[in-house]
Amino acid sequence: MARARSRSRSYSPRPRDRSPPRERKGYDDNRLRERPSSRDHESSGPSGLLIRNLPLDARPNDLRDSFERFGPLKDIYLPRNYYTGEPRGFGFVKYRYAEDAAEAMKRMNHKVIGGREIAIVFAEENRKTPQEMRTTNGTSGRHGDYKRTSHRSPRRRYRSHSRSRSPPRRESRHSKVREDDLYSPRRRSRSISRSPLPRNEREYKSRNCRSPREERVLTPIRSRCLSRSRSRSLSR
């Protein structure tokens, strides 16, 4: 009897699970069947989308309902102003596979969401941190705009580097020497000697002709002196 009972227990049918089957998400099954091997690993193409001209009251669930049908999503992000908390009118959708992102951009570009026509482009892979968003939304200028300061700093370094290697100007060197010579006693004496003589001194020298240097250089004056001396001797 024990054996019969054990056999009856072993052959008793197990109750089946009558729970309803899980609903499958509305992915494009045809694309999944066509590329089973290529979707096993994540592709290297861009998988993030930047969605512009979104309504200000848009929520992540609104984008999920519109974009999740093209493939599994990794993230949905709607940036807001750091200080006011107001939405900025654009958002990011991150797919798991690059093929899904390309398909979503192809089909959803220029579609209407919330009464606005959206524009979709591929987004950069690196999302900004809250600190970067605070810097962008905050005061701009020397401390706020990091890109502007980093863009200007190499130009300043290049200018200073080129100035350090540039040869000194010759004009400044000669002008400095001339100024020093002008205030030196030797230069002062030369300038005095070369200055035009007063009228009385010229008449005196022309009459007496005592300067041998002027006799050698100024031949017309010497001839005049000789003629005047001869006229004086004859008159006497």
From Swiss-Prot:
Residues 149-176 have a biased composition (Basic residues). Its main location: nucleus. GO terms for cellular component: nuclear speck; spliceosomal complex. One of its GO terms (biological process) is mRNA splicing, via spliceosome. Residues 47-125 form the RRM domain. InterPro entries: Nucleotide-bd_a/b_plait_sf, RBD_domain_sf, RBM, RRM_dom. Pfam families: RRM_1. GO terms for molecular function: RNA binding. Residues 1-53, 124-219 are annotated as: Disordered. This is Serine/arginine-rich SC35-like splicing factor SCL28. Belongs to the splicing factor SR family. SCL subfamily. It is found in: Nucleus speckle. Residues 14-43, 199-217 have a biased composition (Basic and acidic residues). PANTHER family: TRANSFORMER-2 SEX-DETERMINING PROTEIN-RELATED. The modification Phosphoserine is found at residue 184. Component of the spliceosome. Interacts with RS2Z33, CYP59, CYP63 and CYP95. Involved in intron recognition and spliceosome assembly. Probably active at the 5' splice sites. Keywords: mRNA processing, mRNA splicing, Nucleus, Phosphoprotein, RNA-binding, Spliceosome.
